[in-house]
């Protein structure tokens, strides 16, 4: 009887820690940005002055100098040539913002698109990737394409020279670590 009691006590002692588990560290859910422009302004604000280059934001009809800007969707058809949004995908965009290198768009171009209801980031991102990869480039050749999404709400597309893309990607990751990558690859 004593042997059984001792065996039972040893088993209870051995298994006492089985129910415990180390606390799991979770990354808090990131708050959804209020607008496409907020995403670009947040990233641009992370740049040191020494990293910044001359940019223009928005579109030609309503541009902002040296800052990201909202893209006036009254002129949405222009997104096909300056942000490479396929013509059949313009209706997928509910809101847009951009920042483009002032001297040469192929050096750096970025658009953030808030998607219309029912549009998936995966489908829109794939269409953007095809458009960039199949574009006929003039006045320089961008080196890298980056496409990220924030759920099915926002898709960010950026392309440019690595000297511009590397700090942009770094600051984007700092500002929005929860964004998922759809594409990050060399432009062939």
Regions found by a protein language model. Name each.
Residues 25-45:
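Post-signal peptide N-terminal segment of mature Sec-exported envelope proteins
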Residues 19-21:
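Bacterial signal peptide processing site
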Residues 102-103, 114, 139-184:
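A short, solvent-exposed beta-edge/loop patch
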Residues 44, 48-102, 120-136:
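Surface-exposed, low-hydrophobicity interaction/linker segments
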Residues 1-5:
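Bacterial N-terminal signal peptides that target proteins for export
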């Amino acid at each position: 009887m004593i042997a059984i009691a001792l065996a039972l006590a040893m088993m209870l002692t051995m298994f006492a820690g089985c129910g415990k588990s180390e606390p799991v560290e979770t990354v808090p859910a990131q708050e959804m940005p209020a607008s496409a422009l907020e995403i670009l302004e947040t990233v641009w604000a992370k740049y040191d002055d020494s990293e910044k280059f001359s940019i223009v934001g928005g579109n030609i009809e309503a541009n902002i100098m040296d800052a990201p800007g909202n893209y006036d969707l009254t002129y949405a058809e222009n997104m096909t040539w300056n942000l490479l949004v396929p013509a059949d995908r313009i209706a997928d965009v509910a809101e847009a913002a951009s920042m483009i290198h002032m001297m040469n768009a192929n050096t750096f171009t970025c658009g953030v698109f808030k998607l219309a209801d029912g549009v998936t980031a995966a489908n829109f991102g794939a269409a953007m990737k095809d458009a960039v990869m199949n574009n006929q480039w003039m006045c320089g050749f961008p080196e890298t394409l980056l496409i990220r999404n924030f759920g099915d709400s926002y898709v960010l597309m950026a392309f440019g020279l690595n000297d511009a893309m590397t700090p942009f990607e770094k600051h984007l990751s700092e500002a929005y670590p929860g964004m998922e990558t759809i594409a990050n690859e060399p432009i062939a």
